[in-house]
């Protein structure tokens, strides 16, 4: 895993209108899923090696310091520019430790991922949910036409 320097981890959102969150956190840069529809691949983000995942150096210390300076709790989006549960997360635990900080500072969280690794941190989502909003959004990619049907009840699928 390569690391890149970071000045900030907790970034204020320009508008809450699109996603309902007032801050974003991206502990990683790049994504290995290769989704053609991903707008994070856009040239405007100046990441020519988007398919290569790198971690941000000292991300947890920076996040802790930035959360400590907050006057009021934030509602934080994770996964806007990189999947927080990429394959490297299983070993690095950056997302898990960031969730511990988000919980400790009474913030809410909205997470976007394609990974079932999210269930590893269900205890933290439950703890955060006791004091703040939690939204977990999972993208399911399939070639099974039956799963694509509008209105499918995923609780009833095998």
Predicted regions and their residues:
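N-terminal [4Fe-4S]-dependent radical SAM core
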Residues: 1-28, 39-55, 59-75
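Cys/His-enriched microdomains
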Residues: 29, 33
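Basic, often amphipathic N-terminal segments
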Residues: 36
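Conserved AdoMet/S-adenosylmethionine-binding subsite of the radical SAM
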Residues: 58-76, 80-158
């Amino acid at each position: 895993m390569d690391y890149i320097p970071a000045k900030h981890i907790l970034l204020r959102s320009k508008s809450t209108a699109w996603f309902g969150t007032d801050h974003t956190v991206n502990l990683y840069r790049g994504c290995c899923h290769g989704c053609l529809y991903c707008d994070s691949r856009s040239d405007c983000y100046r990441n020519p090696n988007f398919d290569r995942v790198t971690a941000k150096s000292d991300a947890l210390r920076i996040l802790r310091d930035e959360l400590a300076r907050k006057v009021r709790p934030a509602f934080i989006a994770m996964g806007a520019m990189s999947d927080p549960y990429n394959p490297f997360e299983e070993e690095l635990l950056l997302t898990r430790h960031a969730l511990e900080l988000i919980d400790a500072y009474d913030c809410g969280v909205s997470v976007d991922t394609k990974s079932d690794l999210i269930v590893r941190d269900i205890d933290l989502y439950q703890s955060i949910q006791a004091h703040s909003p939690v939204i977990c959004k999972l993208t399911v990619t399939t070639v099974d036409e039956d799963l694509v049907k509008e209105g499918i009840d995923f609780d009833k699928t095998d």
